[in-house]
């Protein structure tokens, strides 16, 4: 029995030693663990180098890595927040420079073609005017059934089908065709009818993108004979005149230029708002010091 007790005491002492060594090792590890600060600082250096080269995506990636890989590296994460603000600020500043240069290009494109169109705008009640092709203005087309194009100053294009060939169709759609190929609008969301000296006049509007591909079809076939069909309670067919095909094709290009300019304005506004926000946050942090 005595030998068993002695053996048990030795086992207990050995176990205590092992526990003590494990505890000591854990304490040493705790003393050496910096929460990943050193490794996180390396990511910060890489982010700063990327920022110097204006590689904004790489800089953001390195900063985000600190938050994901080293969540306890509090000092590095704090520095990362400040560095991210610098990245955002410089990225938006560079974006503004690019957008300004693109606006110069677009403005030159507009200046080279806008003389080919007529701008109709009554400043008394219109904030946004509309461009028409000269051959399609109202005064030159009284009593004619045709498809008219227009583009507003923000680059939004639409078609208007005008029917006044006698009687009523109550038309709400049009179809254009060349041989067996065709495009057809869906039913117009904006159609209206009136009379002028007893003659019925019907109009229906179709916005680009909601036109069933009619605009694109006309542009693709502008040098071909296109048949135009008004669709209502009955149908009416006529041939598109060459000037009408040309008008819609050229208005499409004008719409591309104007819509591009409008998008640049929106992007500049967004960039300036971001710069304002980041600058304000940076100032608030400086004041808190």
PLM region spans:
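Short, charge-rich amphipathic alpha-helical segments embedded
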Residues: 36, 60-92
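Internal interaction segment
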Residues: 199-205, 223-289
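Single conserved hydrophobic/aromatic residue that forms the stacking wall/gate
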Residues: 1-14
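Bacterial lipoprotein signal-peptidase II cleavage site
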Residues: 33-39
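C-terminal motif of bacterial Sec signal peptides marking the signal peptidase cleavage site
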Residues: 28-31
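Alpha-helical linker/edge segments of TPR/alpha-solenoid repeat scaffolds
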Residues: 84-114, 125
């Amino acid at each position: 029995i005595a030998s068993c007790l002695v053996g048990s005491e030795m086992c207990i002492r050995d176990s205590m030693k092992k526990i003590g060594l494990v505890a000591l090792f854990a304490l040493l590890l705790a003393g050496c663990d910096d929460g990943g600060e050193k490794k996180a600082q390396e990511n910060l250096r890489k982010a700063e180098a990327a920022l110097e080269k204006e590689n904004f995506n790489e800089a953001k990636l390195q900063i985000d890595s600190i938050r994901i890989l080293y969540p306890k590296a509090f000092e590095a994460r704090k520095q990362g927040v400040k560095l991210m603000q610098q990245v955002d600020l410089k990225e938006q500043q560079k974006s503004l420079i690019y957008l300004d240069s693109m606006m110069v290009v677009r403005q030159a494109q507009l200046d080279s073609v806008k003389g080919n169109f007529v701008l109709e705008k009554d400043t008394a009640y219109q904030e946004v005017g509309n461009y028409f092709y000269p051959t399609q203005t109202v005064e030159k087309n009284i009593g004619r059934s045709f498809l008219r194009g227009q583009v507003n100053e923000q680059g939004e294009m639409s078609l208007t089908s005008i029917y006044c060939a006698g009687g009523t169709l109550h038309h709400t759609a049009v179809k254009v065709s060349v041989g067996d190929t065709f495009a057809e609008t869906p039913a117009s969301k904006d159609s209206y009818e009136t009379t002028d000296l007893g003659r019925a006049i019907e109009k229906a509007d179709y916005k680009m993108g909601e036109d069933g591909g009619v605009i694109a079809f006309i542009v693709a076939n502008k040098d071909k004979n296109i048949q135009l069909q008004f669709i209502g309670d009955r149908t009416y067919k006529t041939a598109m005149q060459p000037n009408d095909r040309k008008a819609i094709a050229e208005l499409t290009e004008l719409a591309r230029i104007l819509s591009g300019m409008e998008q640049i304005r929106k992007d500049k506004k967004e960039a300036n708002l971001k710069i304002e926000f980041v600058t304000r946050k940076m100032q608030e942090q400086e004041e808190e010091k």
